[in-house]
Amino acid sequence: MEPMKNHYLEIPEERKLRIFREEDEDFYSFWERMLDDKQSFYQQPLKRMSSDAWHSLHAFFTASKYGQHQASPAYIKRALELLNNVYLLANHSDQVVEFSVGHRHFSEVGNRSVAGGTMDAWLDEICLAMAARDWRCVELMTIMDESLVRLKDPFDVALVEFVNGVFGNSSALPELLQTVMEKSSPQYLESTRVPYVHSLFIPFVNVFVAIIDGDEAHYQEALRDALEAHYQFYMNEDVRYSPKGNVSLKLTGLAALAYDKYGWTIPETAYLPKWLVYGEQDRCSK
């Protein structure tokens, strides 16, 4: 079976390697500065951790695009270290929380605003944690109420409630799913959000439902449709250069879940790192 298409621009291998090396060097020099006791960049970690987690994820996106998978486990490990802290602090508002960043240890009062990302970012973070099999982080992200996420419209609310319902074993999943589908109607969305929702989120939901139902035929069809929708969306010039398009974190997390639960495999595609889906992080980093 031929690999599925991707939207990546053709770049000479030499240039790919140069770009990756620059990104990799930036990642390590950034964290060397951040964790240097003398420079004390991390005097106020609550203000930095969420954005610094995404700094690490951008390095992962670049490495994935250029096939440098051996570097990615370090990027993901740092991102999840920070995200665990972010959601631990957000879920323990007004309580003193002990946590670490690298070799440095902190004691801070929890604050709900430490999270405060968009629904899209929250979903990507959950799926990254799923792919890395960090179930503690998934739990921290899904026990919170939706007020910790910046919600733009009724669809955002419905999708957050559905995802939390899945991980909370809610008996109301059919009703929550129906609400997601209803709120995805253009009448509930800003016009600019319609293609975004229907290219990235509804395909994600369809794949998730197939996993919940244990239906492999539906899963394989929904996954291919979702990958094609991802490809078509990121072919748009407005988003073609977005690092987030290099890997579908949402689908990677679901594919890892399906593999662990049922042993279901994935098609050949740059958007789903096989080593991450199949839990080969240790082998990849050697």
Indicate residue ranges for each PLM-predicted region.
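Eukaryote-skewed repeat-based solenoidal scaffolds used as protein-protein interaction platforms
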Residues: 12-227
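Intrinsically disordered, low-structural-confidence terminal and linker regions
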Residues: 1-10
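Alpha-helical oligomerization segments
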Residues: 214-286
